[in-house]
């Protein structure tokens, strides 16, 4: 049965308007974005099948286009709608950490970095630039791909810091595997960056590794002195 044939108020769009988006299941929210299903499968059923196929919303939203569009009922238009929704969520998070904001709340930083990096299917190394009062200057993605001690260049980080006149930085990167535990390569990168930044009297406050559901802080583990 198509959603249009459901009793009034029971469809996901009606339910959202009457009760609020927070009352919808993952499949119902996804169905609102998909708008319609395909022959023999309404939008909610299609949404459930997609969530099941990819093992969750996060995996679905960060899956490559060719993997999503190969499935029945999902073409370029629906893929674009899903990507637009994911990008809007990231931009909302970015607005929550605006230029000039003082970083006094570690949870705000964690939430921001989680939203920016947790859903990436590839590794990203980024720098959060701060002034002498620990106010945000800018968040910059510097490197993409396999992040190891050979692919992160301290001189590029130093060059960016000098260009933006930052006084302190927090570096971060994600693990697409979802496991946030830092590797030995991560620790080597951190030591090289700390030493390079020290030559220009800039503090490395932390290196945060973003996983699927957690963030590991080098500072909290006592790995940055």
Curated annotation (Swiss-Prot):
GO terms for molecular function: metal ion binding; metallopeptidase activity. Keywords: Hydrolase, Metal-binding, Metalloprotease, Protease, Zinc. Disulfide bonds: none annotated. Zn(2+) binds at residues 173, 175, 186. A motif (JAMM motif) lies at residues 173-186. Residues 102-224 form the MPN domain. One of its GO terms (biological process) is proteolysis. The keyword Iron-sulfur does not apply. Transmembrane segments: none annotated. This is UPF0758 protein Sbal_0377. It comes from Shewanella baltica (strain OS155 / ATCC BAA-1091).
């Amino acid at each position: 049965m198509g959603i249009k044939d459901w009793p009034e108020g029971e469809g996901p769009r009606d339910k959202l308007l009457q009760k609020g988006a927070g009352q919808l299941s993952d499949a119902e929210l996804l169905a609102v974005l998909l708008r319609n299903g395909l022959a023999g499968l309404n939008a909610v059923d299609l949404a459930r099948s997609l969530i099941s196929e990819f093992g969750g919303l996060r995996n679905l939203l960060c899956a490559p286009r060719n993997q999503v569009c190969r499935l029945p009922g999902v073409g370029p238009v629906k893929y674009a709608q899903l990507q637009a929704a994911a990008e809007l969520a990231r931009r909302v998070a970015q607005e929550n950490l605006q230029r000039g904001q003082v970083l006094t709340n570690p949870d705000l930083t964690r939430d921001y970095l989680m939203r920016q990096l947790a859903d990436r299917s590839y590794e990203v190394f980024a720098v959060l630039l701060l002034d002498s009062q620990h106010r945000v200057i800018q968040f910059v993605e510097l490197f993409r791909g396999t992040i190891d001690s050979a692919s992160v260049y301290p001189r590029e980080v130093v060059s960016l810091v000098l260009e933006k006149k930052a006084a302190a930085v927090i570096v971060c990167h994600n693990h697409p595997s979802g496991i946030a535990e830092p590797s030995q390569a991560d620790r080597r990168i951190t030591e090289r960056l700390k030493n390079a930044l020290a030559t220009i009297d800039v503090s490395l406050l932390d290196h945060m590794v973003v996983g699927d559901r957690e963030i590991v802080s080098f500072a909290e583990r006592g790995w940055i002195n």
